[in-house]
């Protein structure tokens, strides 16, 4: 048998196999589900949208103290007055307390 005859025989065999495979009928059996279930849940979280501030003032003989406490930190401010000013020191301390309070409220 010559090489050309073998090649022709192999080619005709593949032609028959491919012709036979083209006559196969395919059936689609994909099924779509009728009901679907979602597994998503929601959690609601709330928090307080503000902070609490506590102000306190203390007037001593020679100084004025201011304490400010919030939910996050505490701040203390002390202002010393000059000694020997007499009644002027007390009036100045009252004015200082009022000025600090007004500044914090604005």
UniProtKB/Swiss-Prot annotation:
Covalent lipidation (GPI-anchor amidated glycine), chain numbering: 84
Tell me which residues are glycosylated: 67, 72
Modifications after synthesis and translation: The GPI-anchor is attached to the protein in the endoplasmic reticulum and serves to target the protein to the cell surface. There, the glucosamine-inositol phospholipid moiety is cleaved off and the GPI-modified mannoprotein is covalently attached via its lipidless GPI glycan remnant to the 1,6-beta-glucan of the outer cell wall layer.
**Keyword Membrane part of the UniProt annotation:** yes
Where found in the cell? Secreted, Cell wall; Membrane
Q: What positions belong to the pro-peptide in this record?
A: 85-106
- Domain of life of the source: Eukaryota
Its GO CC terms? extracellular region; side of membrane
Which keywords describe this protein according to UniProt?
Cell wall, Glycoprotein, GPI-anchor, Lipoprotein, Membrane, Secreted, Signal
* Cleavable signal peptide: 1-19
Identify its protein family: Belongs to the TOS6 family.
The identity of this protein, by name, is Protein TOS6
- Show the taxonomic lineage: Eukaryota, Fungi, Dikarya, Ascomycota, Saccharomycotina
Name of the coding gene: TOS6
């Amino acid at each position: 048998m010559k090489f050309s005859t073998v090649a022709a025989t192999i080619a005709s065999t593949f032609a028959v196999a491919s012709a036979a495979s083209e006559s196969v009928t395919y059936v689609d059996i994909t099924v779509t589900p009728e009901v679907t279930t979602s597994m998503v849940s929601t959690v609601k979280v709330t928090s307080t949208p503000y902070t609490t501030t506590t102000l306190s003032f203390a007037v001593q003989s020679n100084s004025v103290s201011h304490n400010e406490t919030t939910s996050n930190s505490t701040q203390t401010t002390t202002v010393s007055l000059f000694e020997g000013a007499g009644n002027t020191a007390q009036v100045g301390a009252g004015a200082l307390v009022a000025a600090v309070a007004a500044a914090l409220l604005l």
